[in-house]
A protein has these predicted regions:
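C-terminus-biased signal that marks the final domain/tail of proteins
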Residues: 1-119, 213-257, 262-421
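Internal mixed beta-strand/loop scaffold within catalytic domains of large alpha/beta enzymes
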Residues: 101-208, 224, 344-348, 356-359
Length: 421
C-alpha cells in the first residue's frame, strides 16, 4: 500500500518462497515500473544499440556464475518474486536472470562512476554528540538512475522465518539491503568506494548487507559475516548497533576487510577509505586525490560540529545541506555538496529507540515520515491502520521546494533537450 506521504509500504514474512511470492504478487506493477525506468535510463546513458548488445553479452558472460554467489535463501526469494515480472524485457534475459543481475546494479554503478550513478554520505553520533546521548545515524543514498526510478520508494518490513525482523528501504524487486535497521537495533548503510575492476562474479554488496541485517545484532557479528563473504566491489558499510551503543565502518574490498572506528563519539563516511589498513592502497589514494569524497567528508565534519548535539531534525538539516566548506555557495547539484539533488532516498535512524525517518520525494526535500519498529514488530501481525507516526514526522524543506526545485527541474529538462538535439 501507499501511505499518505507517497511512500510504498510492504509487510512480508515467512520462508523465502512465501516472501518472494507475496512481494511479487503485491508489487507486480511497481516492479515493471522500476525495470522500465532502469532500462530507459541505461539507454539514455548508452544510446548505441550496438554497444548495448555488446554490454548485454558481456554481463551474461561475466555474471554467468552469479547465482552460485548468492545464498540459497535469497535465490529462492528472488526466484519466487521474478515469476511476476514482465516478459517485455526478455531480450535482456529471463525474469530470474534479470532480477539476479539487477541486485548487482549498485556494484555495476561503481564501474560507471563517471556518470555519477553512485555517491553517498553518512554519519553517526552518540554520547555527548547526540542530544539525548543515544545513537543517531543519517545517510543520503545517492544512486542516480533518473528521477523516475526514485519516484516510488519502498520500505519493506520483513519478519523472516529465520533471523531478525528488519526494515529496509529500496525499490520493488530489491531483496538486497541498501539502508536498513533490524529489530535488535542494528543498522546497515552502504557507501561505494574505489577499487580494482571486478574480474569475476561474487556476492552483490546489497545481499551481504541483507545477510548482516537479518542475522547480526552486534558489530562483532556483522564483522564476522562481512569477513567471510567475497564481494564484487569495494565498499564501506557503516554499521551502528544499539547493543554496542556505537558505530563503525567496515571497509571491504573483494580481497580483504578493515575496521574503521573513528575518533570520539561520532563517525563520518563518504566514498573513500579512512583506516590505516588502506592508507597506501593505490586505488584509495587515487580516489582521495581525484574525487569529491574528501571534500564532502570535511563538510560533514563542519556540520556535525556546528549542529552538535544532534537531534533527528538537525540530522535532516545535514542531509539537506547544499553548501560547500565554510558555508560557501557552490551552486545547486554540485558533486561536492552533501545534497546533490540525486538521492534515491535519505534516512535517519535512532537505533536505541527503534525509530527511523524516511525522506519523501523529491530527493530529501519532502517531509520525513517516521516508523517505530518496536511497534510494527511487537505482535504477530503488523498494527492495523497507518504504519507511520504522523505526529513524529519532520517537515518538508518548503523554501527549497518553492525557490530552487523548479530551477533544478528546468535545468535538467533543458540539458536533456540539448543532448537529444
Amino acid at each position: 500500500r501507499r501511505n499518505p506521504a507517497g511512500v510504498w509500504e510492504l509487510t512480508t514474512g515467512g520462508d523465502p518462497l512465501t516472501r518472494g511470492a507475496e512481494s511479487g504478487a503485491l508489487l507486480r506493477g511497481l516492479m515493471y515500473y522500476q525495470e522500465r525506468a532502469f532500462v530507459d535510463q541505461i539507454r539514455r546513458i548508452v544510446p548505441s544499440e550496438r554497444y548495448l548488445r555488446f554490454l548485454r553479452s558481456f554481463i551474461v558472460i561475466f555474471n554467468r556464475n552469479l547465482g552460485h554467489c548468492v545464498p540459497e535463501e535469497y535465490r529462492r526469494e528472488i526466484f519466487a518474486s521474478s515469476r511476476w515480472c514482465s516478459h517485455e524485457f526478455d531480450a535482456i534475459g529471463n525474469a530470474y536472470e534479470r532480477q539476479i543481475n539487477y541486485h548487482a546494479a549498485h556494484d555495476i554503478g561503481h564501474v560507471m562512476q563517471e556518470y555519477m550513478l553512485v555517491g553517498c554520505s553518512s554519519f553517526a553520533t552518540w554520547g555527548g554528540r547526540s542530544a539525548d546521548s543515544t545513537l543517531l545515524v543519517g545517510r543520503n543514498f545517492d544512486f542516480y538512475v533518473g528521477d523516475d526510478f526514485a519516484r516510488n520508494k519502498l520500505v519493506t518490513f520483513c519478519r523472516p522465518e529465520r533471523g531478525i525482523p528488519f526494515a529496509s528501504v529500496g525499490w520493488a524487486g530489491m531483496s538486497g539491503v541498501l539502508s536498513g535497521m533490524n529489530a535488535a537495533g542494528l543498522t546497515v548503510t552502504l557507501n561505494a568506494a574505489k577499487g580494482a575492476l571486478p574480474t569475476r562474479a561474487a556476492t552483490p554488496i546489497s545481499l551481504l548487507a541483507r545477510t548482516i541485517l537479518q542475522y547480526a545484532s552486534t558489530i562483532e557479528e556483522a564483522c564476522a559475516i562481512a569477513d567471510t563473504t567475497r564481494t564484487f566491489v569495494s565498499e564501506s558499510l557503516l554499521i551502528a548497533s544499539a547493543r554496542d551503543r556505537r558505530a563503525v565502518v567496515i571497509e571491504k574490498t573483494p580481497e580483504r576487510s578493515a575496521l574503521y572506528e573513528g575518533e570520539g563519539e561520532q563517525l563520518r563516511c563518504t566514498n573513500h577509505y579512512q583506516s590505516a589498513a588502506f592508507a597506501d592502497d593505490p586505488y584509495n589514494r587515487e580516489n582521495i586525490a581525484t574525487s569529491d569524497s574528501p571534500y564532502r567528508l570535511q563538510r560533514l565534519g563542519e556540520l556535525l560540529d556546528s549542529l552538535a548535539p544532534l537531534t533527528p531534525a538537525r540530522a535532516v538539516t545535514i542531509l539537506r545541506d547544499r553548501r560547500g566548506l565554510g558555508g560557501r555557495d557552490i551552486g545547486l547539484t554540485n558533486e561536492k555538496s552533501l545534497n546533490q539533488a540525486i538521492a534515491h532516498h535519505s534516512v535517519v535512524f535512532a537505533p536505541e529507540r527503534g525509530l527511523m525517518w524516511l525522506s519523501t520525494e523529491p530527493w530529501q526535500a519532502g517531509r520525513f515520515v517516521c516508523y517505530d519498529l518496536g511497534r510494527i514488530f511487537a505482535g504477530e501481525a503488523p498494527p492495523e491502520g497507518r504504519l507511520d507516526l504522523p505526529e513524529e514526522e519532520l517537515p518538508a524543506d518548503s523554501l527549497f521546494l518553492r525557490e530552487d526545485y523548479p530551477r533544478i527541474v528546468a535545468y535538467r529538462r533543458d540539458c536533456a533537450a540539448l543532448r537529444q538535439a
